[in-house]
Amino acid sequence: MSDILQKICAVKREEVTAALAAKPLAIVRAEAEAQPAARDFVGAIRGRITAGRPAVIAEIKKASPSKGVIREDFRPADIAPSYEAAGAACLSVLTDKPFFQGAPEYLQAARAACALPALRKDFLVDAYQVYEARAMGADAILLIAACLSLAEMQDMEAIAHGLGMGVLVEVHDGAELEQALKLRTPLVGINNRNLRTFEVSLQTTLGLLPRLAAEADRIVVTESGILAPADVALMRENGVNAFLVGEAFMRVPDPGAGLRALFG
């Protein structure tokens, strides 16, 4: 695990301890179970791909540890419908405060402003956060293989599926991919950003594809570094049709127009 990831995960464990003290697990679990049915995150992605179109998980992100503030004019309730009109399949909304200046309220505002399923983009280290995600309205969660043991991922996945949520498992290398393929979720995200150096290489996705050749039911989601139509074309030529993109859209005045420009 990289230094930045270790630091983030340590802060997350502190957040969970504080959250548990403020709101016991039984209460947040009841809140999660009382939510209306989740929107179908996996189905939205699969539907786009089946129709021969790219499935775009469009991200709503104000800042990042490596880049600082990415978007000053940050209004999730305006960004989400802009993405929806441009053809996004799903949303990804940062809820991490200390590192990405995100908030649960951003996810709620974005989801309320459109009909798209929304992923809680955060660093999950405890099952409490899975219930918390559904309680705030998230339709899917992210599990980062670098942060979690296989047993932890399996436990969180089972809880998420029990709550009707989708799961995106994120990997960075072959060892993490081997663990991810032991989960039930079809969604395997490959992050092209090296979390140790913050360098981005699309070869990360391309290099892991041979290991997924026999996994017909898996959907590869390429994450980070999709900045130009040529990047999209390269991925689609190699059979990758699902994309998680944020920064490229956040840096232009109209994020929906950015999505259209990138994916045609």
UniProtKB/Swiss-Prot annotation:
What highest taxon heads this organism's lineage? Bacteria
- InterPro entries on file: Aldolase_TIM, Indole-3-glycerol_P_synth, Indole-3-glycerol_P_synth_dom, Indole-3-GlycerolPSynthase_CS, RibuloseP-bd_barrel
Q: Name one Pfam family in it.
A: IGPS
Does the keyword Cell wall biogenesis/degradation feature in the UniProt annotation? no
- Please list the GO terms describing molecular function: indole-3-glycerol-phosphate synthase activity; phosphoribosylanthranilate isomerase activity
Pathway(s) this gene product operates in, as recorded in its UniProt entry: Amino-acid biosynthesis; L-tryptophan biosynthesis; L-tryptophan from chorismate: step 4/5
Give the keywords, sorted. Answer: Amino-acid biosynthesis, Aromatic amino acid biosynthesis, Decarboxylase, Lyase, Tryptophan biosynthesis
- GO BP annotation list: L-tryptophan biosynthetic process
EC no. given is: 4.1.1.48
Q: Does the keyword Hydrolase apply?
A: no
Q: Which HAMAP family match?
A: IGPS_B (MF_00134_B)
Q: Which NCBIfam families match?
A: PRK00278.1-2, PRK00278.1-6, PRK00278.2-4
**Family the UniProt entry places it in:** Belongs to the TrpC family.
Q: What is this protein called?
A: Indole-3-glycerol phosphate synthase
